[in-house]
Amino acid sequence: MKTVIEFYLSGDRVYSEREKAINQLHINRGYGELKGKRLFLSLIEAAYLLEKGWIKVLDGERELSFYDVVSLGKKKDEDFDVKYLVYKDLRDRGYIVKSALKFGSHYRVYRKGAEHSDWLVWVVRESQKLSPNDITARARVAHGVRKTMVLAVVDEDGDVVYYKVEWTKF
């Protein structure tokens, strides 16, 4: 992407009204959510695109750095850093990544060009204790909406390992 697109901070997300943002980022690459003539990005999406040099984020007159956006994200969500690492890893692999909060997970993951997502991804730290009930509930929801539940485990070095969780019938 040649031209850096301006976005403006608005609460816990950023937006742009530029047609180029809508065309290049939303329509062509699956970023953000379109509401009227505005493209809204989550702070995780904004951090990713800032790190790639595709956008800049303004808070009034002040331009925010990647670290500023991550810091804002961590104020809203203490796990922002690990969720960002998983988001970045999936995007770098060519997948489209959207929120899955309504499904009790962190991300819905689509193959490029797919209309429906294949996976629901739940992000955890390697040191985090997991309840069997949490895993079962998420796997049940994923199964109910015909998705595969994936556990994304981030270790202390920031490496991500993915585990597929599915029902087995005997």
Curated annotation (Swiss-Prot):
GO terms for molecular function: lyase activity; nucleic acid binding; tRNA-intron endonuclease activity. Endonuclease that removes tRNA introns. Cleaves pre-tRNA at the 5'- and 3'-splice sites to release the intron. The products are an intron and two tRNA half-molecules bearing 2',3' cyclic phosphate and 5'-OH termini. Recognizes a pseudosymmetric substrate in which 2 bulged loops of 3 bases are separated by a stem of 4 bp. It catalyses: pretRNA = a 3'-half-tRNA molecule with a 5'-OH end + a 5'-half-tRNA molecule with a 2',3'-cyclic phosphate end + an intron with a 2',3'-cyclic phosphate and a 5'-hydroxyl terminus. Belongs to the tRNA-intron endonuclease family. Archaeal short subfamily. It comes from the Archaea. Disulfide bonds: none annotated. It is an enzyme of class 4 (lyase). The keyword Lyase applies. GO terms for biological process: tRNA-type intron splice site recognition and cleavage. Homotetramer; although the tetramer contains four active sites, only two participate in the cleavage. Therefore, it should be considered as a dimer of dimers. This is tRNA-splicing endonuclease. Keywords: Lyase, tRNA processing. The keyword tRNA processing applies. Its EC number is 4.6.1.16.
